[in-house]
Structure formats: structure tokens, C-alpha cells
Amino acid sequence: MSLKTGLKLAKNYSINFSLPKRSKRKIKFIIIHYTGMKKESNALRKLCHYNSKVSSHYFIKKDGEILNLVPDLYQAWHAGKSSWKNIKSLNRYSIGIEIHNPGHQHGYKSFSLKQINSIKKLLKYLINKYKIQKKKRFRSFRYCS
């Protein structure tokens, strides 16, 4: 799928999401994670395997390709039992993005330039589409409990 922004998304659906569809107005946050796994293929498999009980809306590969795993209007399972201020269960109100990176456990590496360019385009698109307020943009590990 090609968006008006020039962003190209590949479909690779995960079955890990909650029904029913949510209103576009419910989406208030974007939460970005890194995978923390050595192999990109293992991270993607985990995000799409039912037994893992984890998913995200988008997955950004090392080469910058963006995979759309869960449609935006469904609740992906990326934030766990989370809260921020007086809001519980951030999965209900957020878009989750996973960027492939082995993380600190496996020799943390800088994100590729292609990943950085892709996340910038994707964020711009999502922020405009869902009117995400600047004060509701944060890094998941720092502000969520």
C-alpha cells in the first residue's frame, strides 16, 4: 500500500490483536519499541505468532521496509499492562511501532539510516492522520508503568 506521503507499506499480518475495531478518535498515542532480538526474522515471527501474545501495528526492518502487521483501528498487543497518568491499558489508545534492533542484551547497534528515514515518514503520517498531540508523544520504557 502506498500512502499519500510516499510511504510504502508491505502487508504481513499478525493475528495478535483485539476486536472490535476502535474509533479513529480513540488513538491518542504512538509508542515506539525496539525488538531486542538478534535476528529480524525471529522478531517478526514472534510478533505474528499467536502463542507469543505480542504484536505491533508496524515493524520497521533494518533495510527500512515498513511492514503493517495490525490494521490501525484494531488494538495491537505491544504495551502490556500499562498506564500513563490516569489512563490504563495504553494498547487501547495507541499505535505500536517496533524497530528491529538487537538491543542491549545482544550488542546494541545504531539504527540504520534507512530505519530512521522510515520512522520519520511513518510518524509524520500517523501524527497527522490521528492528530496526535505533542505532549502525548513519549518513549515507552521511560514513562509507562
What is the predicted function of each stretch?
Residues 129-145:
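Acidic/histidine-rich, metal-coordinating catalytic segments
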Residues 2-131:
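Active-site-adjacent loop/helix surface patches within enzyme catalytic domains
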